[in-house]
Amino acid sequence: MLEPISLAEFEQCRDNKEALVYLANRQRLALHEAPSQSLFRVVALFYCEVGPRANRTKEVIEGYNAEQSYIGGAICAERAALTQLRKYTDPMILEIVITTDSVEAISPGILCREYLSTSAEPDTTIVLGNNDGSIISTFALHEIHPYPYVYRRYRRDQMARAGEAFGLKCRQCNTKNNNESMGWSEKERALYDAALKAVDTSPRILSLHPISFGAAVRFADDSVESSGYLPALEYGASVCPVQLLCRELDKRVRADGPRPVELVQVDQYGTAHCPFASARTLLNEHFNKDLKVLYHDEEALERTCLSADLCPPPPGASFLTHDAFLGTKDQGALRLL
């Protein structure tokens, strides 16, 4: 059985990033097997402060990636660690250390980043290391997950009120105070309207969750496709409207048809949101990275970015590429400190 890292051992390494990466790699190499489909091990160590205000303590939480035979059901090491925080009162993540089987220091995936953005502060330190500790990168969470979901801190019973208030703010800010250089064009507003019309607010949809979404994409020939949201009672099986539109994007790409040029996702209250994690991943892995995305920022102003901006590489580290993934069978040995 894998021996967990003790709090004392972790805290002895706090000021030494190489030592922290060594601990994570030690745990990785001690795993009895790799996940069954990727054959790629990832370890995430979370250093946390937990407990009621009068009796706060520190904890080290270990997370490991796991997979079923269908790869869509995989869970990353970071999310595996985060689920363990459910047993603690008021957990605060102080530092995260991540290592993998790769010869490069590999970034957390977009799903991991999105999940972290709801649980950790934007300035939370993340330390990445490669499989032998020879490459180390340190940065803050906000550097790798821009344009987060504006409702990420609300509970279900707060969502509708928050959505209504923020939607009103969006309308007020962009009819009175917005600078024309920051606002959307008439053509972009028409795309926004198409997405808003696609939002399904039927009782069945809103009984599953109080926020619903629609999305629309414009292609280079000025044709527009839109889609609503497909939520499920098993929340993790829900499919966002941008994911549903990816099928149309894929058909046109395969047919060498017109490229997608603009995209927007909106909720029933009128707030435009950047795509969620699964859609961000699909857009950047399969389609052109210069797709323009319309969104409202956290001040409720109309903004645009490119799809590539949704998934920035971490400073001093890499995304896991197909070539790097296939080259990870030589899984590295620990460098002694």
Range-by-range predicted roles:
Residues 1-337:
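Zinc-dependent deaminase catalytic domain
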